[in-house]
């Protein structure tokens, strides 16, 4: 029995360890003069994606590249970064970062919420998200939420489990359309694909996924009444991380990173002109 319990705890330890990541703490980097942070991610159009060569790129990636350069230039150390995980699942990435140790940062469309602040540390916000209510192009435009039971009659709402957009869909169901049919997906990408493939599907999707659908010319319709621009995205770190003060300093330096030409160039590069126009709407 004793041997069985020992084996059980060893297996539990190794299984748990395999589900998390490790990176060097700022304290270690400062002491040693060198180190590496681990960058976990969830693939998100424009924010974190792979280019034609298979290289990870995007808004989040470019910002973290600037952060690493800033640390090296201002602190006199040699900091590097490595990507961990496969980027396939929001919930998986979030949970692994939450349970990780040291210099681990999660990248993607992670909304800053009070609930999540109890589980992970956040960087300052790096963008204001623009969540968009979408359907097939043949669905009449929704004039007001009270019309959901009639305008969206017979439609199914798709949403990825554990996301802020899932909460939005459930709020619509509770407040305006109790008989609404819902279907869970694993990722936001899957949600988009479901709506594209189902003429009677609808969803809330972040700006990046809406732009992807528009580029694909899939006949997706935006319902402006549903636009939501109150939330902000941030990078996440485990609660044991000592990198958050340095991250805050980076965003505040030189008049504010979000006010810099480097940041604006990153947005234009990955969102394009259509995305920039919608971002201006989000800021109003």
Regions found by a protein language model. Give the residues of each.
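Sec-dependent N-terminal signal peptides
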Residues: 4-16
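Extended ligand-binding regions for polar small-molecule ligands
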Residues: 20-23, 27, 61-70, 138-164, ...
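Extracytoplasmic small-molecule ligand-binding "clamshell" domains
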Residues: 20-109, 118
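Beta->alpha turn/N-cap motifs
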Residues: 40-45, 85-90, 100-114, 136, ...
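Periplasmic-binding protein-like
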Residues: 41-43, 127-135, 140-141, 207-252, ...
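Ligand-binding cleft/hinge of the Venus flytrap
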Residues: 65-81, 162-186, 214-215
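Hydrophobic residues within well-ordered alpha-helices
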Residues: 67, 94-98, 191-197, 235
């Amino acid at each position: 029995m004793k041997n069985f319990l020992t084996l059980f705890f060893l297996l539990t330890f190794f299984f748990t360890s395999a589900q998390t990541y490790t990176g060097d703490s700022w304290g270690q980097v400062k002491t040693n003069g060198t180190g590496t942070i681990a960058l976990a991610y969830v693939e998100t159009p424009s924010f974190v994606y792979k280019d034609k060569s298979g290289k990870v790129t995007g808004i989040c990636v470019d910002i973290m590249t600037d952060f690493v350069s800033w640390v090296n230039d201002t602190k006199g150390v040699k900091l590097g970064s490595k990507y961990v995980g496969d980027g396939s699942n929001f919930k998986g990435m979030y949970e692994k970062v939450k349970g990780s140790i040291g210099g681990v940062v999660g990248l993607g469309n992670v909304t800053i919420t009070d609930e999540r602040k109890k589980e992970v540390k956040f960087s300052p916000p790096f963008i204001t998200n623009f969540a968009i209510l979408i359907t097939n192009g043949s669905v009449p435009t929704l004039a007001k939420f009270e019309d959901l039971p009639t305008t969206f009659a017979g439609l199914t709402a798709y949403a990825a489990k554990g996301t802020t957009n899932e909460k939005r869909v459930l709020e619509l169901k509770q407040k305006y359309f109790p008989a609404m049919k819902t279907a869970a997906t694993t990722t936001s990408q899957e949600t988009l694909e479901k709506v594209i493939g189902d003429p009677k599907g609808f969803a809330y999707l972040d700006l990046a996924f809406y732009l992807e659908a528009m580029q694909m010319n899939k006949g997706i319709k935006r319902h402006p009444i549903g636009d939501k621009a109150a939330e902000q995205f941030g990078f996440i770190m485990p609660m044991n991380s000592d990198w958050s003060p340095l991250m805050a300093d980076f965003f505040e330096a030189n008049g504010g990173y979000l006010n810099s030409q480097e940041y604006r160039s990153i947005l234009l590069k990955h969102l394009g002109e259509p995305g920039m126009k919608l971002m201006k709407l989000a800021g109003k």
